[in-house]
Curated annotation (Swiss-Prot):
The lineage of its organism: Bacteria, Pseudomonadati, Pseudomonadota, Gammaproteobacteria, Enterobacterales. GO terms for molecular function: metal ion binding; tRNA-guanosine(34) queuine transglycosylase activity. Its EC number is 2.4.2.29. Binds 1 zinc ion per subunit. PANTHER family: QUEUINE TRNA-RIBOSYLTRANSFERASE (PTHR46499:SF1). It comes from Buchnera aphidicola subsp. Acyrthosiphon pisum (strain APS). The gene is tgt. Substrate binds at D89, S90, G91, G92, F93, D143, G214. The keyword Transcription does not apply. Keywords: Glycosyltransferase, Metal-binding, Queuosine biosynthesis, Transferase, tRNA processing, Zinc. GO terms for cellular component: cytosol. Signal peptide: none annotated. It comes from the Bacteria. This is Queuine tRNA-ribosyltransferase.
Amino acid sequence: MNFKVLYQDNNARCGVFNFNQEIIETPVFMPVGTYGAVKSISTEEIKNTGSRIILSNAFHLYFRPGLEIIKLHGNLHNFMNWSGPILTDSGGFQVFSLSRFCKVNEEGVIFQNHIDGKKTFLTPKISMKIQSDLGSNIVMIFDQCIEYNQNWEKTKNAMERSLYWAKKSRIYFDSYKNKNSLFGIIHGGIYPSLRDISLQELIKIDFDGYALGGLAVGEPKIEMYKLLDHICPQIPKNKPRYLMGVGKPEDLIEGVRRGVDMFDCVIPTRNARNGHLFVTNGVIKIRNKKYKKDLSCLDNTCVCYTCRYYSRSYLHHLDACNEILGARLNTIHNLHYYQTLMSNIRNSIKNNTFEQFSVNFYKQKNKIDF
């Protein structure tokens, strides 16, 4: 993977990834396909929303369907029929958030897996092997995630352990001699001084990109933005910056404003399944009875499949009947909205009009009552 920044408007950056001749423009939003599927839609439909790179979760795929099944197909790309790049999360977050029993030592984590309750040992070495077997284009280091608002000492200990695992991840990743990329993850909770130490040590190890972990886990938005203001300027300018698990449309705007290049989040797909649909002026809650006889499309500025062929009335009906088609059409629309937003952001950076674009974005938002 090669990465190059081509345009800059203040701190906002527009660049390109080159994955073996496949070009991905940044800033980029990655739909989440945890189990090798973006819920309710096919890979062809994912591509038609404008999505070119997706995220899957190595932790979940390790347990279901298991590496043996995926390797029968060659790799995860073949298994799910996706020709574009895939970033895999190592599973650190899931280990610490899903497990009923979790014991951490220097080598890794012993936990009860959420499938059958069996004790499982996961280490940087195992995580790198899993992601290598999946054929991930971007591999994330194995890290220790902690809850928001932990005290300084607990946060420092977790950050230092993540650094130790980062070094191990680098060694084991390099041993596979593949041409894929490895990203480090900056930790340190809400403490800027710990974030500084984490980043500087990760830079010494030398990763292909740097992710900001442990954000959007309960902290006030202003706190997240302040941390981005603090840490993004310190990340090497020639390396991509990835804000993990974020965000809402306004988070994408504010992340890009601070120099972030990559995002992922379940919000567009999860909200779609719950009938919350993103449009130019805000959010439509399609299950509200006011849409029962509304013959208009979701958003007359949108050219997605859903907006071209279906009315709000029909989408309201599908939601009321719990029809699977409703989730599918809603997901297509929300992902198309996100990818259109990212495309517009990129164009504004290229034209040095990002600030005006963001002003217009907030002006349009919530102009009418949904």
